């Protein structure tokens, strides 16, 4: 049973890696080509990529070594933030949140591998699988919301949804695997993600029109009516 959990979380880690690689390819093509080519760019490949990952064989038919495949260049890609020009300054925070979620997922795989004998009931295992399946669409949503033109409110909403899903996965994994001490790094990672999320939230609020001040013309008309 623990093999099913390990494979499920491993597939999730693979989806994160595939999403990052697809994001790099998309952004390079959108920002490094002439404007007329940008207008003709079709974002469908990334949707097909993630969709293909979601339609793989059943977890029971996969080995952990087959699903946890790391791109040899992925670490360099994640550490390099110079490949995209972002005048808004929000893209780096989105990437940071994706990095944190990616790291948490990889470490959850390792923890699950070491906690097979401590697993609780099959219901707990099912909870992990259900929550893990909810994360990949959230990753897809965040990646697609990073396409220009950027909408701060959309970025805020989708990164919040992703972080909530990952936090939920952490909770059910802790409960199912009896994880207790030595997990400060999880809370620290989530706190770091919250800091980046706060920047996106402030940008979303700043993008909303200021409704605190009344319209001068409307105010004068109201006074005349009185």
UniProtKB/Swiss-Prot annotation:
Could you tell me where this protein is found in the cell? Endoplasmic reticulum membrane; Cell membrane; Secreted; Secreted, Extracellular exosome
Residues spanning the membrane: 4-24
Q: Where is this region: Required for interaction with MYRF?
A: 1-88
Segments carrying the region annotation (Disordered) are 207-226
Q: Which UniProt keywords apply?
A: Cell membrane, Endoplasmic reticulum, Membrane, Secreted, Transmembrane, Transmembrane helix
Q: Biological process GO terms, please? A: canonical Wnt signaling pathway; gene expression; negative regulation of myelination; negative regulation of oligodendrocyte differentiation; negative regulation of protein localization to nucleus; negative regulation of protein processing; T-helper 1 cell differentiation
Q: Output the superkingdom of the source species.
A: Eukaryota
Question: What is this protein's function?
Answer: Functions as a negative regulator of MYRF in oligodendrocyte differentiation and myelination. Interacts with the C-terminal of MYRF inhibiting MYRF self-cleavage and N-fragment nuclear translocation. The secreted form promotes differentiation of T helper 1 cells (Th1).
Regarding protein family, the annotation reads: Belongs to the TMEM98 family.
- UniProt-listed PANTHER family: TRANSMEMBRANE PROTEIN 98
User: Subunit structure, briefly?
Assistant: Interacts (via N-terminal region) with MYRF; the interaction inhibits MYRF self-cleavage.
Name of the protein: Transmembrane protein 98
Organism lineage: Eukaryota, Metazoa, Chordata, Craniata, Vertebrata
